[in-house]
A protein has these predicted regions:
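N-terminal segment of the mature soluble domain
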Residues: 78-152, 191-194, 221, 225-239
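C-terminal/domain-edge helix-coil "capping" segments
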Residues: 47-79, 169-172, 178-245
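Short acidic, glycine/proline-rich loop/turn micro-motifs
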Residues: 94, 163-164, 208-211
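Surface-exposed short loop/turn segments
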Residues: 132-191
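Bacterial N-terminal signal peptides
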Residues: 34-43
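N-terminal export leaders
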Residues: 28-32
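N-terminal secretory signal peptides that target proteins for export/translocation
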Residues: 1-27
Length: 245
């Protein structure tokens, strides 16, 4: 019986006077009903509706990132230094030559906004170039750089074109985010895998964008910005209102 729930009896309250009834504050249900009516009148999306409802009743709660939840590491509070590296297949490089660099820069930009210390990506790029454009594994990076955490985003696919519709634009991508912590074993630093998360990204989810209303380069930039935020939110905690859906 230790784990059984016990229902407490309801307390009896005296009937309210007419004046007290008139002065009662609206209930939460009444607030929510008013919010729904207001949002519908303003043509707000369902997402905005629930964000507003959540903020009304609960404030703007902080969401724990998958990385924090899965590893116990808080990149902000623990003051960890992070190395971020992206990799893309040749099929992506041949069509979107700048996307690897752009995603790296934009993801790091978002980490820095949270005061997360990040290894200079130019130093990482120089190291890789000096090694013939390749790096063997995360431990190789751990030995060369003074990082506490290594984040490797392995992008499997990336496109900005709607399938079978050259006049329409829609961003699609998928890949895997790997996380490693760096530890010293004997006299050598090694990277230990502590986080793996597959991801898929689609933008916009509903209706593709006409190529007549946006240039391909402008659309690609917007999509890279959105993807960078989605990836960054896997790594640091954020408020519910900041969630990219």
């Amino acid at each position: 019986m230790d784990d059984a729930l016990t229902a407490l009896p309801l307390q009896q309250t005296p009937p309210e006077s007419e004046s007290r009834k008139g002065n009662r504050l609206p209930t939460r249900s009444q607030f929510l009903f008013a919010l729904v009516v207001t949002c519908l009148a303003c043509n707000l999306t369902g997402c905005s509706l629930f964000v507003m409802a959540g903020k009304l009743f609960f404030g703007d709660p902080k969401m724990m990132s998958p990385f924090h939840a899965g590893t116990g590491y808080d990149l902000v509070e623990d003051e960890l230094t992070v190395l971020v590296i992206f990799s893309t297949p040749e099929s992506v490089k041949s069509e979107f030559s700048s996307v690897e660099y752009d995603l790296t820069e934009e993801t790091i930009r978002r980490l820095k906004r949270r005061d997360i210390k990040v290894i200079d990506p130019d130093d990482v790029a120089t190291f890789i170039d000096d090694n013939g454009g390749y790096w063997e594994d995360a431990s190789e990076l751990a030995r060369h750089f003074d990082a506490d955490i290594i984040v490797h985003v392995d992008l499997d696919s990336f496109t900005c074109d709607e399938e079978n519709s050259p006049s329409l634009l829609r961003g699609r991508a998928d890949g895997i985010v790997y996380g490693y912590d760096v530890r010293k074993v004997g006299d050598e630093k090694v990277a230990r895998e502590i986080f793996v998360r597959e991801f898929t990204s689609t933008h916009p989810r509903q209706t593709p964008v006409s190529a007549d209303s946006s240039s391909r380069s402008a659309f690609q930039k917007r999509y890279v910005d959105l993807m960078a935020t989605q990836i960054a939110q896997m790594l640091y905690d954020y408020h519910a209102s900041e969630l990219i859906r």
